[in-house]
């Protein structure tokens, strides 16, 4: 042990010094680094330190706050035995990495044994899938006071909406709660909890079953009690979860979310319209929205909501991504260091048909987003297992023209090989005057790959020549597809 825990100087001026001669403060710095870089409660965490020698043991136990000492109980941890042996430290209840190594009954008993220590439980993270029977037992217990509880994460083992609903008084006595994450678990009385959880910073509601539907009005009412909320995810399981009617809300009644910087939504446009009509989030800089399959959706309130966010007014790059199951429009600032470089905005629709996807892009640009005067780079890419047919009918040509029309400030257009013929073919159908009104600021065309096929080369040549003759020359470049 001494050989492993020693360090020798160089030359004859330095004597050999063992770690035992280091002062307590230095040892604590080393211990702190060790504890924060190892899995809590694992074999290489702080329990290893207390078995080295009596001095280390005393030093560790005398510094529980400095070292943030915690006990980790998993479903395979014999909680009653372990908690009787170790000091009365804060408890983390975690799914662990090998849930299948214990029977469901034994795992449930271990979790419930740890929950008996109401005043010590700090984190409950059961993200590997909680069975309905265990969820009922936990939910019943969590109606009791848990004064130190800060984080709760439950992921239902059933993603079909069959998980039991959480009771009205769930977590009603957890005043220090900072993070709540529920996946595929209905909680119709969420609004009641939010009024008592004023310290909540992270609220993640994913895969919300229809049985757990929360109206936009109830959601906004609950959010009004969370001035420190920084991250918010609201994702419904199906398009069945929608408001019965859109209510007109006067702008003077909007709820301010001053700390919110991250927002994710999945659902129908009507719900998002009702929600964004009632809130303001001036610091928001990362938005991700996924609509269920909707060909027509009005999002005027979403447009106004985005327009009120200062950090989203300087987005200079856009990418349209066509995938097998969805289409996505992503916007970001120019890739350069700076405090505003973390701004992100993405709009997606879950649909498969290419004409529906093109229509969605048009609606994103015309109905959901304010004008884009700072958008100078446009990337259009396709990620499909099968290629689109080579033919380009009149309907698709018109859809491409309509989808590209809002990008009036774009100087650089990047196209993947799969889309060159389709995009340039559509633009070439326009008369000379109309053709230059499309992408009027375009200066450079970037084509993926270095050896375009004969058909690609023909489309490229015709487009570049047409722009040259119209007095709007375009430089041709090759590029390698980037990952944002």
PLM regions with names:
Residues 1-484:
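Leucine-rich repeat
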């Amino acid at each position: 042990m001494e050989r492993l825990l020693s360090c020798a100087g160089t030359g004859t001026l330095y004597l050999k010094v063992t770690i035992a001669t280091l002062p307590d403060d230095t040892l604590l710095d080393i211990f702190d680094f060790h504890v924060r870089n190892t899995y809590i409660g694992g074999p290489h965490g702080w329990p290893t330190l207390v078995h080295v020698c009596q001095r280390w043991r005393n030093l560790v136990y005398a510094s529980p706050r400095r070292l943030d000492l915690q006990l980790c109980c998993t479903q395979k941890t014999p909680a009653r035995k372990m908690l009787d042996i170790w000091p009365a430290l804060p408890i983390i209840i975690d799914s662990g990495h090998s849930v299948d190594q214990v029977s469901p009954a034994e795992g449930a008993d271990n979790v419930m044994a740890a929950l008996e220590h109401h005043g010590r439980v700090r984190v409950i993270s059961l993200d590997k899938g909680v069975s309905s029977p265990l969820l009922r037992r936990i939910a019943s217990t969590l109606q009791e006071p848990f004064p130190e509880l800060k984080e709760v994460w439950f992921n239902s083992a059933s993603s079909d909406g069959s998980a039991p609903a959480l009771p009205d008084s769930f977590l009603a006595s957890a005043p220090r709660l900072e993070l709540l994450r529920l996946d595929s678990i209905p909680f119709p009385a969420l609004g009641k909890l939010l009024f008592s959880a004023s310290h909540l910073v992270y609220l993640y509601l994913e895969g919300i079953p229809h049985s757990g539907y929360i109206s936009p009005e109830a959601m906004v009412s609950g959010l009004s009690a969370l001035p420190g909320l920084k991250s918010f995810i609201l994702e419904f399981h199906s398009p069945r979860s929608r408001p019965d009617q859109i209510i007109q809300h006067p702008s003077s009644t909007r709820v301010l979310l001053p700390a919110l910087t991250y927002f994710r939504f999945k659902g129908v446009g009507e719900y998002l319209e009702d929600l964004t009509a009632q809130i303001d989030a001036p610091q928001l800089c990362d938005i991700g929205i996924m609509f269920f399959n909707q060909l027509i959706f009005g999002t005027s309130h979403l447009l106004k909501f985005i327009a009120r966010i200062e950090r989203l007014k300087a987005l200079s790059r856009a990418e349209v991504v066509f995938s097998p199951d969805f289409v996505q429009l992503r916007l970001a600032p120019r890739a350069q260091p700076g405090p505003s470089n973390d701004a992100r905005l993405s709009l997606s629709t879950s649909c498969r048909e290419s004409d529906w996807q093109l229509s969605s892009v048009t609606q994103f640009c015309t109905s959901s987003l304010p004008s884009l005067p700072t958008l100078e780079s446009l990337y259009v890419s396709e990620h499909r297992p099968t290629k689109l047919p080579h033919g380009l009918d009149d309907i698709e040509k018109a859809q491409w023209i309509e989808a590209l029309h809002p990008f009036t400030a774009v100087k650089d257009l990047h196209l993947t090989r799969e889309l060159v013929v389709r995009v340039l073919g559509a633009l070439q159908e326009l008369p000379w005057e109309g053709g230059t009104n499309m992408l009027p600021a375009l200066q450079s065309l970037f084509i993926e790959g270095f050896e375009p096929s004969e058909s690609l080369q023909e489309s490229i040549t015709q487009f570049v020549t047409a722009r040259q003759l119209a007095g709007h020359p375009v430089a041709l470049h090759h590029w390698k597809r980037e990952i944002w």
